[in-house]
Structures are given as C-alpha cells and as structure tokens.
Amino acid sequence: MARTKQTARKSTGGKAPRKQLATKVARKSAPATGGVKKPHRYRPGTVALREIRRYQKSTELLIRKLPFQRLMREIAQDFKTDLRFQSSAVMALQEACESYLVGLFEDTNLCVIHAKRVTIMPKDIQLARRIRGERA
C-alpha cells in the first residue's frame, strides 16, 4: 500500500480540556505524607439518623412561624376577607398542622418499608391517606 501525504484538517469539535482550579492542582500535586487534609465526611445515612434522633427528642415547632402565618392567612382569604386571628389561634393551628404532617409521614414511612424501599414517593403518601380514609 502506497504512503499518502497527510493534510491538516480543521477539528470538528469535541470538548476542550477543562482547566483545573488552583486548589485541585495543589491538592493533587501535594505529597501523600503532608499537605492539604481532606475535609471530614460522615458516611451516608449517619447525619440523617442523627437528625431523626434530634427531632424525635424535640418538641419545638418545625415550620417557621411567619411563613406559616402567611400561608394560613392566604388560605383563610378564600373563605372570608378581612379575618383577624389571635396569636394563640395561629399557634393552635400550627400545632395541629405539624401534628397531622408528622403522623402522615409516619404512616407514609410504613408504606415505604412495606414496599421494601427507603425513599418516600408521592404514591406512598397517597396510599397512606387512602388507608386512613381521607381520600377516596
């Protein structure tokens, strides 16, 4: 087979090599014995379990007061305008709402475990509500 002369061709694209940040380059070029220490990371699920224990111990309200109050007033306007609420009424409604949501998530979690999963999906919430008799 005869040799042919190669001609220069225009490149048709492709990705250009990415430039690394100075910190990444320094981290890679640092010797193994000393240099930049990797930040500590907990194993997946450890922080989630810690948060579960923390929130199960606590009794404080988890939804911020002002956003809840704005939402409550917005919903109440659909029924009657210029309604006024005592602060104790707002607190009672928030307590009831959070209690309902916590119970719903507990039931939803049972549905998730029954399905041999660990991730909550909308269908789990729908099933929990259907079993409770809230949604036909």
From Swiss-Prot:
Residue list for modification N6-lactoyllysine: 10, 15, 19, 24, 28, 57, 80
Record's subcellular location: Nucleus; Chromosome
N6-(2-hydroxyisobutyryl)lysine: residues bearing it: 5, 10, 15, 19, 24, 28, 37, 57, 65, 80, 123
Modified residues (Asymmetric dimethylarginine): 3, 18
GO cellular component terms attached to this protein's record: chromosome, telomeric region; condensed nuclear chromosome; extracellular exosome; heterochromatin; nucleoplasm; nucleosome; nucleus
Region (Disordered): 1-43
Post-translational modification: Acetylation is generally linked to gene activation. Acetylation on Lys-10 (H3K9ac) impairs methylation at Arg-9 (H3R8me2s). Acetylation on Lys-19 (H3K18ac) and Lys-24 (H3K24ac) favors methylation at Arg-18 (H3R17me). Acetylation at Lys-123 (H3K122ac) by EP300/p300 plays a central role in chromatin structure: localizes at the surface of the histone octamer and stimulates transcription, possibly by promoting nucleosome instability.
SMART domains (alphabetical): H3
GO molecular function: DNA binding; protein heterodimerization activity; structural constituent of chromatin
Sites of N6,N6-dimethyllysine modification: 5, 10, 28, 37, 80
N6-butyryllysine PTM sites in chain numbering: 19, 24
Gene3D superfamilies: Histone, subunit A
Residues annotated as signal peptide: none
Tissue note: Expressed in testicular cells.
Phosphoserine carried by residues: 11, 29, 58, 87
Modified sites of kind N6-(beta-hydroxybutyryl)lysine: 5, 10, 15, 19, 24, 57
Modified residues (Symmetric dimethylarginine): 9
PROSITE patterns per the UniProt record, alphabetical: HISTONE_H3_1 (PS00322)
Similarity field: Belongs to the histone H3 family.
Name of this protein: Histone H3.1t
